Amino acid sequence: MALQNMDISLSTEQLLQAQAHVWNHMYAFANSMSLKCAIQLGIPDILHKHDHPMTLSQLLKAIPINKEKSQSFQRLMRALVNSNFFIEENSNNQEVCYWLTPASRLLLKGAPLTVAPLVQVVLDPTFTNPWHYMSEWFKHENHATQFEAANGCTFWEKLANKPSMGRFFDEAMSCDSRLVAHVLTKDYKHVIDGIRTLVDVGGGNGTMAKAIVEAVPTMKCTVLDLPHVVAGLESTDKLSYIGGDMFQSIPSADAILLKFIIHDWDDEEGLKILKRCKDAVGIGGKVIIIDVVVGVNHDVDEVLEDQLHFDMAMMSYFNAKERTMNEWEKLISAAGFTSYKLTPAFGVRSLIEAYP
């Protein structure tokens, strides 16, 4: 068909805006990979160690890169500034200086609230390759998940069969737990005050549980996770580890904590977990759920988009999902809980307290 005969009903301005929108999403991965590169090169750490803004020439001396690629590095910094990971300032000699933003402070390696390990896990080829199988997954029944199509095994089998990847993932989850625990014990401590015993289901190496017992010294915590996850971890009088299966049995306690657990499963499996939790706490107890509630805090910058990204990731990895409040209500009610309380406490995520 001749171009002049195509009726697209768009003005020139609309046409070019539409093209820019497509291109923006076509190359959105460039932001992700530039972020990954910044962490791998240690740019945030170098700036932080310097303790004040650095010029491009200072950065180039401090960062172990091929000096013939200095101009390319400047372009990387320009992209990262545009993504709000760094800011530009003018120095006395008019050379541009770079400094940290709140977001890049979360990328400092070894910092208490760093999210750098999580970024590196999510952007590792093991976890990015499944996205290339999305259309095939929709069309065929060969694989239960996109992850399985890409890797030849399930997500959990991959972590169990490759210990280095398992440790990589555990550290990513630990860094997330430290940030969540910081907010929970600082701003929502009343949620855990008065609890004598708590089981952190899927609590990994106990990062979250350790922070909780430090904040509430009268509490005793138990971490329940798969045997290979808790193997070798030492219990104390306040914190113990149990290797087990949450689908089979959950130890009794005043409260059960589910942080980023239910979203890994479809409704059928999620319902089984919640029923086990309800039985474990009994009347007078509660289940504390920290997870995404799609649409909550949607008016906060980037939150809804993050929630939808997480939803697509859960579909890719597990054929699971993030849930709206209506979907959460149905699941909580079906599990036999009589009431719940929702608190939009964690930005992209929310706090749900479910009562038998």
Swiss-Prot record:
Specifically expressed in the peltate glandular trichomes on the surface of the young basil leaves. Its EC number is 2.1.1.146. The keyword Electron transport does not apply. S-adenosyl-L-methionine binds at G202, D225, D245, M246, K259. The keyword Heme does not apply. Pathway: Aromatic compound metabolism; phenylpropanoid biosynthesis. One of its GO terms (molecular function) is (iso)eugenol O-methyltransferase activity. InterPro entries: COMT-like (IPR016461), O_MeTrfase_dom (IPR001077), Plant_O-MeTrfase_dimerisation (IPR012967), SAM-dependent_MTases_sf (IPR029063), WH-like_DNA-bd_sf (IPR036388), WH_DNA-bd_sf (IPR036390). It catalyses: (E)-isoeugenol + S-adenosyl-L-methionine = (E)-isomethyleugenol + S-adenosyl-L-homocysteine + H(+). The active site is at H263. It is an enzyme of class 2 (transferase). One of its GO terms (biological process) is phenylpropanoid biosynthetic process. Keywords: Methyltransferase, S-adenosyl-L-methionine, Transferase. Belongs to the class I-like SAM-binding methyltransferase superfamily. Cation-independent O-methyltransferase family. COMT subfamily. Homodimer. Phenylpropene O-methyltransferase that catalyzes the methylation of the para-4-hydroxyl of chavicol to methylchavicol. Can also convert eugenol to methyleugenol but with less affinity. This is Chavicol O-methyltransferase. It comes from Ocimum basilicum (Sweet basil).
